[in-house]
Amino acid sequence: LAVISTAAARDRLTLSYMASSGVHMAMALLAKDKAESNFDSLAEDWAVPEKIEELLQEIPFDAGKLSVAITDELSKIQVNALVKFPDSRQFNESQVMLWDRFLRFIRNEEELEDENNPVAIVNSVKDWLDSGDDEATTGLSGAESSYYEDLDPPYASRNGPIQDLDELLLIKGITPQIYYDNPDAPGLASFMTVHGMAAGAGTSFNWPGRININTADGPVIAALLGLEDQDLAQAIVEFRQEALEDKDNHDFSNPRWYKEIPGFGDVVINPSLVSVGSDVFRIQSDASIDTTKASIIAVVQRVQDPESRKWTCKVLSWKTE
C-alpha cells in the first residue's frame, strides 16, 4: 500500500510539472507571436493544434501525455464593459445593444420573459457593477443590494467590477438555464469574460469592450451584427475558415475584412465594438499518466517591458484541477 501511495504521489507531482510546462510553453509562443505580428487570427501558430503539438514534442517526458489549447479571451463579450469605469454610473450604450442582441440570439422569446428579458438582465447587471449611486435602481427592473439582502441566504451587490464570471449567477434574472450551455442552446458562460481591463488616465481603468472579430465564435459575431443581419453570422464564420486556408490572399489586419464576403457590401458592424488583436489568452494544459490526470487553466496577458521592449506574459489567473 505504501509503495502504491508513493507511486501515486510521484505521478501527481510529475503531472503538475508537465501541465505547468505546457502553460509556460504556450506563454513563450504567445510572446513570440506578439513580437512578430500586430494582429491575432486563427491562422497563427498559437491557434493551430498541429503547431502546438510540434512544440510539445520538444518537451522531454519519460511517460505520460500532454495537450495544450490556447484561446483568445478577447474573442468574448467583456461583462465589465457594460458600464463606463471608473465611476461605473453610466451605460456604454453600444455594449447594451451588444448584450441585447446576444441574449436574443441565444434564447427564444419564451425564455426571455419577465425578469429574464434582455432589458431586465442588462439593468440588473449594471446595478451589480455600479457604485456611488446611493443604491439607485436602474429602470423598473434593476436590483441593488436591498433586493439581494432580502433573499435566503442574503448577500450584497458587488457594486464594482465582476471578478469571477460565475458571479453572474448571483444577479437577478440570470438563471443557470441562461448561464450554462444546454443541448439546445449556448449559454452566457461560454461567450463572456471578466478580463480585458485597460489602464486609463492616471490610476483610472476601463474595459474597452472591443471583440477580436478574427477569433470570435458565431454567437458573438451574431451579437455584433444588427438583429436583421444575425443570420449572416455563420457566413462570416465560414468565410473566415475558408480564408485561413488561403491566408496569403486575405488581410486579417483590417477589421472590415468581412466586407469581402459576397453580399456584405451594406453590412455594417459598429467599429467601436471590434478589433483584430488581443493580449489576453486562456491556456488549458492537460497532462495524464495512465488514468491519473491533472489540468491547469491559466489566463495570461502579454505585456511589454518599457526598457527592453521585450514581450512576456503575465499570469492573471491560475487554476489547477
Give names to the regions the model predicted:
Residues 1-321:
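Compositionally biased linear targeting/interaction segments
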